[in-house]
């Protein structure tokens, strides 16, 4: 089943109980290279880490968070915020490292909860209310997702009692839709605003970014 729907379809009854959030983070040195026109490499790493901190901080008020990453700096920051941390087992040169990391975290968490949420780690303008509303809407379906503000990417993927089947990467919204996930249509601008480009960051700042991101940007003006 695929398509684009607002909440309201009958639940299959598998969506009860707590959900767990997965955030997959690549090495900070390799992250957000499209921000290079506005930040030096060192500053870019600081901003990426700050966006992760703000994302974890917001998400953890809604559900427990596990970060899967090969990066020790990101892992330490996540631990300091009370998030679980899983070392990314993905081998170097893997053809699909992001989705492999997510599936490793899913396998790790499934013993504790059948309900999994995947969030991007670069949602500095996301409000806890937005994630809570999206999570409530997602419980209507076995699998669903929230597209990014451009309509091509995926900010969040939800699976209740079924495998995640992540399809993150280029044109992930289309791939998730074709895989049977339902696209949620709520107005959640912060949740939809993941950061890849300078324009994305400007949009997030207009919405209002979290304190860590605001401080990281202000320190390098």
Curated annotation (Swiss-Prot):
Q: Which SUPFAM superfamilies match?
A: Nucleotide-diphospho-sugar transferases
Catalyses which reaction(s): phosphoenolpyruvate + GTP + H(+) = enolpyruvoyl-2-diphospho-5'-guanosine + diphosphate
Q: What class of enzyme is it?
A: transferase
InterPro entries listed in its UniProt record = CofC, Nucleotide-diphossugar_trans
* GO BP annotation list: F420-0 metabolic process
Q: List the effects observed when the gene is inactivated.
A: Cells lacking this gene accumulate 7,8-didemethyl-8-hydroxy-5-deazariboflavin (Fo) to five times the wild-type levels but do not produce F420. They are also unable to decolorize triphenylmethane dye, and are sensitive to oxidative stress caused by the redox-cycling agents plumbagin and menadione.
State the EC number(s).
2.7.7.105
| Xref: Pfam families | CofC
Recite the UniProt keywords alphabetically: GTP-binding, Nucleotide-binding, Nucleotidyltransferase, Transferase
For this protein, what is any one GO molecular function term?
A: phospholactate guanylyltransferase activity
Pathway(s) served: Cofactor biosynthesis; coenzyme F420 biosynthesis
Q: Where does phosphoenolpyruvate bind?
A: 154, 169, 172
Say yes or no: keyword Nucleotidyltransferase present.
yes
Q: Does the keyword GTP-binding apply?
A: yes
Role according to the record: Guanylyltransferase that catalyzes the activation of phosphoenolpyruvate (PEP) as enolpyruvoyl-2-diphospho-5'-guanosine, via the condensation of PEP with GTP. It is involved in the biosynthesis of coenzyme F420, a hydride carrier cofactor.
Give the family from UniProt: Belongs to the CofC family.
Q: What is this protein called?
A: Phosphoenolpyruvate guanylyltransferase
Lineage per the UniProt record: Bacteria, Bacillati, Actinomycetota, Actinomycetes, Mycobacteriales
Question: Which gene is this protein's source?
Answer: fbiD
């Amino acid at each position: 089943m695929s398509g684009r729907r607002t909440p309201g379809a009958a639940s299959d009854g598998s969506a009860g109980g707590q959900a767990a959030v997965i955030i997959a983070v690549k090495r900070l040195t390799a992250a957000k290279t499209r921000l290079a026109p506005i930040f030096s490499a060192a500053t870019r790493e600081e901003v990426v880490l700050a966006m992760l901190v703000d994302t974890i901080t917001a998400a953890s008020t809604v559900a427990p968070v596990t970060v899967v990453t090969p990066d020790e700096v990101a892992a330490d920051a996540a631990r300091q915020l009370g998030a679980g941390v899983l070392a990314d087992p993905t081998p170097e040169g893997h053809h699909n490292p992001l989705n492999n990391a997510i599936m490793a975290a899913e396998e790790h968490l499934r013993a504790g909860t059948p309900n999994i949420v995947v969030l991007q780690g670069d949602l500095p303008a996301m409000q806890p209310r937005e994630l809570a509303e999206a999570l409530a809407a997602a419980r209507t379906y076995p699998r669903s997702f929230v597209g990014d503000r451009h309509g091509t990417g995926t900010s969040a993927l939800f699976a209740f009692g079924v495998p995640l089947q992540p399809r993150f990467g280029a044109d992930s919204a289309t791939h998730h839709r074709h895989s049977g996930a339902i696209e949620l249509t709520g107005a959640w601008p912060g949740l939809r605003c993941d950061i890849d480009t300078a324009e994305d960051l400007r949009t997030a700042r207009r919405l209002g970014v979290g304190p860590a991101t605001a401080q990281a940007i202000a320190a390098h003006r």
